[in-house]
């Protein structure tokens, strides 16, 4: 009954439509920001911070709203707080990224330290399976182990 309701109302399809839009927007966002920064292409950075990031956030917030409706229709509320934290964290991180770019473009900061650093390779011979450990890839800083 619940699955029929969700399909009939298009919620499942709407969710995946928004998910696809979010992933399409985020897939190479960091690479493009780094490239534009390295090339000092401030117009591209402005386009990203003022248009692309807000569009991704809008799609993500709508996706989150739809996902919550699906969850509450299909399951008990217990456990949804984990999706709140994860999706809310992505939204907050995108907002912070936009603010950092805007601060740079407005001259509030002269450089973006996080974009000056050499990128670490994703795979190395000594690497453990960190890509499957959210708690270990959320930051390059070890302070998150104390939270």
Where are these regions (language model features)?
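Catalytic domains of carbohydrate-active enzymes that cleave complex glycans
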Residues: 1-147
């Amino acid at each position: 009954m619940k699955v029929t309701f969700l399909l009939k109302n298009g919620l499942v399809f709407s969710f995946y439509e928004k998910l696809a839009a979010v992933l399409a927007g985020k897939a190479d966002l960091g690479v493009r920001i780094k490239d534009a920064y390295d090339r000092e292409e401030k117009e591209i950075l402005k386009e990203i911070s003022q248009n692309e990031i807000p569009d991704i956030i809008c799609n993500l917030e709508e996706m989150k709203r739809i996902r919550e409706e699906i969850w509450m229709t299909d399951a008990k509320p217990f456990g949804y707080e984990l999706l709140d934290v994860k999706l809310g964290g992505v939204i907050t991180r995108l907002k912070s990224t936009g603010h950092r770019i805007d601060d740079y473009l407005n001259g509030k900061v002269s450089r973006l330290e996080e974009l000056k650093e050499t990128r670490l390779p994703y795979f190395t011979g000594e690497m453990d399976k960190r890509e499957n450990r959210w708690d270990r890839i959320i930051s390059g800083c070890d302070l998150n182990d104390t939270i």
